[in-house]
Curated annotation (Swiss-Prot):
It comes from Cronobacter sakazakii (strain ATCC BAA-894). ATP binds at P98, M99, G100, G101, G102, L103, G104, G105, G106, S107, S108. Keywords: ATP-binding, Isoprene biosynthesis, Kinase, Nucleotide-binding, Transferase. Belongs to the GHMP kinase family. IspE subfamily. It catalyses: 4-CDP-2-C-methyl-D-erythritol + ATP = 4-CDP-2-C-methyl-D-erythritol 2-phosphate + ADP + H(+). Its EC number is 2.7.1.148. This is 4-diphosphocytidyl-2-C-methyl-D-erythritol kinase. The active site is at K9, D140. Homodimer. Pathway: Isoprenoid biosynthesis; isopentenyl diphosphate biosynthesis via DXP pathway; isopentenyl diphosphate from 1-deoxy-D-xylulose 5-phosphate: step 3/6.
Length: 288
């Protein structure tokens, strides 16, 4: 069995700049990885089978993102004559990231499967090819495939490499799961934030346009942010439900975590501009 890191991400800022004709929203956001996340487990098989060894309660196997990613890569490799005879895999995930938390867990899992199976099966797809497969699974998957902090536009698929400060974060989960459509479907969501350049946005104070909706509709999110803001600059990540506070040192973040009320679960992690997955592929590190 091989173990592969599947890191979390934070949206350091998130602005909604318009609604598209297809119902999706245009946005501008800044992705950064954390040195914390899930672990994807892969055991190569030689009988051509793909098996899920860690089912997720409430998620049908055909809807599971790691299985969808594996089937997508297998199909593309077969179409292009790159699939080794008998290539298959047992697939699983050790979950640490909450579902519906805004940390990108499912997208990260899918990207890790694409990148790791491409490596294990030696199918030879380029980063661009894997990213094009990934966007079929979700708008956030390409940033995890590419493994570099990025400024994203469009629906999140147009990526420009970025190098935000690698700060320490206390990431807290308020104990609720927020489906993305709940936030994007709210009539009070800000949808007309002016489009600005990456250079301009990096100089401004960071905000998340989804935050006021999450706080309005989920009192747990409001309470978590109110508590964190007593100690440090804090924001919602993605559409929630997770929130985060930023610190200059690990010790500062851990001191605040020790004071957290019982109802607020969290962890401390460092923001990193290069994904632990890419380091694992390069043989520079093992999974956490």
């Amino acid at each position: 069995m091989t173990r592969w890191p599947s890191p979390a991400k934070l949206n350091l800022f998130l602005y909604i700049t318009g609604r598209r004709n297809d119902g999706y929203h245009n946005l501008q956001t800044l992705f950064q990885f954390l040195d914390y996340g899930d672990t994807v487990l892969i055991t190569p098989r030689m009988d051509g089978e793909l098996r899920l060894v860690t089912p997720v309660e409430g998620v049908a196997q055909e809807d599971n993102l790691i299985m969808r990613a594996a089937r997508l890569l297998m199909a593309r490799a077969r179409e292009t004559g790159r699939l080794p005879e008998g290539a298959g895999a047992d697939l699983g995930v050790e979950k640490r990231l909450p579902m519906g938390g805004g940390l990108g867990g499912g997208s990260s899992n899918a990207a890790t499967v694409l990148v790791a199976l491409n490596h294990l099966w030696q199918t030879g797809f380029s980063e661009d090819e894997l990213a094009r497969l990934g966007v079929q699974l979700g708008a956030d998957v390409p940033v995890f495939v590419r493994g570099r902090a990025a400024f994203a536009e469009g629906v999140g698929e147009l990526l420009t490499p970025a190098s935000p400060a690698e700060k320490w974060y206390l990431v807290a989960h308020p104990g609720v799961s927020i489906p993305t459509p709940v936030i994007f479907g709210d009539p009070e969501l800000t949808r007309d934030t002016p489009v600005r350049s990456m250079e301009t946005l990096l100089k401004c104070e960071f905000h998340n346009d989804c935050e006021h909706i999450a706080r309005k509709r989920f009192r747990e999110v409001d309470a978590a942010l109110s508590w964190l803001l007593e100690y440090a600059p804090s924001r919602l990540t993605g559409t929630g439900a997770c929130v985060f506070a930023e610190f200059n040192t690990e010790s500062e973040a851990r001191r605040v975590l020790e004071k957290a009320p019982e109802w607020l679960k969290g962890f401390v992690a460092r923001g990193v501009n290069h994904s632990p997955l890419q380091q694992a592929i390069a043989g520079q590190t093992e999974s956490w």
